Amino acid sequence: MSKNERMVGISRRTLVKSTAIGSLALAAGGFSLPFTLRNAAAAVQQAREKVVWGACSVNCGSRCALRLHVKDNEVTWVETDNTGSDEYGNHQVRACLRGRSIRRRINHPDRLNYPMKRVGKRGEGKFERISWDEALDTIASSLKKTVEQYGNEAVYIQYSSGIVGGNMTRSSPSASAVKRLMNCYGGSLNQYGSYSTAQISCAMPYTYGSNDGNSTTDIENSKLVVMFGNNPAETRMSGGGITYLLEKAREKSNAKMIVIDPRYTDTAAGREDEWLPIRPGTDAALVAGIAWVLINENLVDQPFLDKYCVGYDEKTLPADAPKNGHYKAYILGEGDDKTAKTPQWASQITGIPEDRIIKLAREIGTAKPAYICQGWGPQRQANGELTARAIAMLPILTGNVGISGGNSGARESTYTITIERLPVLDNPVKTSISCFSWTDAIDHGPQMTAIRDGVRGKDKLDVPIKFIWNYAGNTLVNQHSDINKTHEILQDESKCEMIVVIENFMTSSAKYADILLPDLMTVEQEDIIPNDYAGNMGYLIFLQPVTSEKFERKPIYWILSEVAKRLGPDVYQKFTEGRTQEQWLQHLYAKMLAKDPALPSYDELKKMGIYKRKDPNGHFVAYKAFRDDPEANPLKTPSGKIEIYSSRLAEIARTWELEKDEVISPLPVYASTFEGWNSPERRTFPLQLFGFHYKSRTHSTYGNIDLLKAACRQEVWINPIDAQKRGIANGDMVRVFNHRGEVRLPAKVTPRILPGVSAMGQGAWHEANMSGDKIDHGGCVNTLTTLRPSPLAKGNPQHTNLVEIEKI
């Protein structure tokens, strides 16, 4: 057998094992590995005391299983899932470099070990150790005072995604134990949206009534895959295996893959058939140019549009819409703007050549089924709501919705085993704000209104935010926009009067705490974690404490139970219901078993560590029931159909207060934005800047692990053409700046990014002298981003920025 013949049959297990050993050799600087690796592993096996199942439950969503080897109450090394035969559709849930480095997080010398109170100014990071009693008494006293003086609407649970997978440990504010505690004590100000998906989650329901997409594995049945800003090789690189499933599904279908992105991503990386670099924020213009070709060359699915859609042309336009207010008129230039959306028009905006737009339109119009999807980068723009709905128009125009191998234009859906979560109870406070608007609510809350600021539940806020819970999240500073402005707001103690931070490390956000509490990590306590982004295989992971509690670190449930005691016996009883954390897990799992008898018992799951189950329906096809019978299975839109023209959006556009450069439209149109590709500000700040998810971090989690920082340097990507103009060579230290702030970091000069565009991995820890020059040496992109929200969702537009870059 030849060498080539042997390589054809290489397994995923062998490949990963061999590359892992090779990586170790490289990390050791060329040090030769011994050939007694197997014997050494056996020796370690004999010496260890136990292996404990854990999970990495940070907000990449992959939620990978970990097998932690423990000796003398210390984690000595980490491996990942090794169960099953590891085949397509039933693969091992393997961790990436982040999860595999969790030992370095657990044993990190900078772990928080004791309760502390602030003794300097907020943001200085000056604290002194206090007892748990003092910390808990202070929190309870401040909470009582806030509620008595301002009411429960003045209490806010900060957006957090540091622990998204946990049940008892989950940090998502709408589903956390903190939310349950506050609902036992009169409630707190609600929030809507997310930093990840605010615009698409808001916009897509106006079209479809929901935000569903076909599963990745359904690409087995596709002839063409078109990905707008979707980069699972970095955003969903492990665990559930979206990247792996994408490649295996394409092997089966031989589908052509076209990647549309300003950056040549790892999802492309030689696997794509074509990369089309596009200016950030112009995806809707590309869609319009494609639509012009589809319409003029009779490539639209007219029967589908007539039967299932509202507002494509005059035939299905709602009665309350203006004449020529339909989508076809907009594309052909017969609408209000009198501009035909030709490929030439689209090319001038997007930077994609006219002939390539025409070719792409014909490919989309003739390849059926076509899987057209979008990641969450395109929607994280100031015009992101319009972009999300616009991309959905391509499968709508071509009739690819509701069929196997097609898609809705949304991101891929996944099969998940539904778990019974800790009930948070009802919130007596019905007012809510966008999760991105909390700094406004601190600074000028009573001035925030429903029609200008997106306040829901009442016409305006009555009080500003005075008390903040910040549990397992870095959005207080690092992941929020315009850090310098946010610093000014938080440092003013007359505004927000109490900030409680519950954390593992002294993060950028923790420095602003008044009371700082040391939390256990998820792997240090008992919990059950379900999969999230995992194709058509769901799983549950049972976490057991990897070590005993160390120093004075405590689990979140204990912390909140102790606060509840201090708020009154009725609050304590309502919060705990007389149960410990373990008893809650057993109680909730019993409810799961009652609904899903196929699950293993609690003790069996605990012994197994991980339980896997394939989707019994095979591939998930979004809106299939609607496609099969639209009358029996209407969508959750007012018409029950796909609403290309939304009367609800027309009413919002008519009644809301908007800035002159903001657009809310009943149609999925293209609109330019502030700090966009054609902004006058480009004369001063000529480069567009966006952030991307970096493989060494999940947002900011793992951002303090030295090994990962060394392996994946924080850099600003810049095209060679732009670099040459500025005298910048690869690796040069540069300053990236605009009117909001300045960041200093190395330059990555690469043709993998479009000229006129720059990019930085988001989530790097902010490092600046906030009482001095405020220059960020950590490379945090949010030093440069804006607090101005998007028009409809009031979401974060952290990819809409203009900067200049100069060599230092």
UniProtKB/Swiss-Prot annotation:
Listed PANTHER family: DIMETHYL SULFOXIDE REDUCTASE CHAIN YNFE-RELATED (PTHR43742:SF7), TRIMETHYLAMINE-N-OXIDE REDUCTASE (PTHR43742)
Family per record: Belongs to the prokaryotic molybdopterin-containing oxidoreductase family.
Tagged with keyword Coiled coil: no
Protein name per the record: Putative dimethyl sulfoxide reductase chain YnfE
Alphabetized InterPro entries for the sequence: Anaer_DMSO_reductase, Asp_de-COase-like_dom_sf, MoPterin_dinucl-bd_dom, Mopterin_OxRdtase, Mopterin_OxRdtase_4Fe-4S_dom, Mopterin_OxRdtase_prok_CS, Prok_Mopterin_Oxidored, TAT_signal
Gene Ontology terms for molecular function: 4 iron, 4 sulfur cluster binding; dimethyl sulfoxide reductase activity; electron transfer activity; molybdenum ion binding; molybdopterin cofactor binding; selenate reductase activity
Entry binding sites for [4Fe-4S] cluster: C56, C60, C64, C96
Cofactor(s) it depends on: [4Fe-4S] cluster; Mo-bis(molybdopterin guanine dinucleotide)
Principal subcellular localisation of the protein: membrane
Membrane topology: Peripheral membrane protein
Matches recorded under NCBIfam families: dmsA_ynfE (TIGR02166), selenate_YnfE (NF041885)
Localization, UniProt: Cell membrane
PROSITE patterns (alphabetical): 4FE4S_MOW_BIS_MGD, MOLYBDOPTERIN_PROK_3, TAT
Post-translational modifications reported in the UniProt record: Exported by the Tat system. The position of the signal peptide cleavage has not been experimentally proven.
Signal peptide: 1-43
Cofactor note: Binds 1 [4Fe-4S] cluster. Binds 1 molybdenum-bis(molybdopterin guanine dinucleotide) (Mo-bis-MGD) cofactor per subunit.
A biological process from GO: anaerobic respiration
Domain 4Fe-4S Mo/W bis-MGD-type, chain residue ranges per copy: 49-110
Keyword Cell membrane part of the UniProt annotation: yes
Gene3D superfamilies: 2.40.40.20, 3.40.50.740, ADC-like domains, Dimethylsulfoxide Reductase, domain 2
Gene that encodes it: ynfE
SUPFAM superfamilies (UniProt xref): ADC-like, Formate dehydrogenase/DMSO reductase, domains 1-3
EC code: 1.8.99.-
Function of the protein: Terminal reductase during anaerobic growth on various sulfoxide and N-oxide compounds.
Sorted UniProt keywords: 4Fe-4S, Cell membrane, Iron, Iron-sulfur, Membrane, Metal-binding, Molybdenum, Oxidoreductase, Signal
Domain of life per record: Bacteria
Enzyme class, broadest EC rank: oxidoreductase
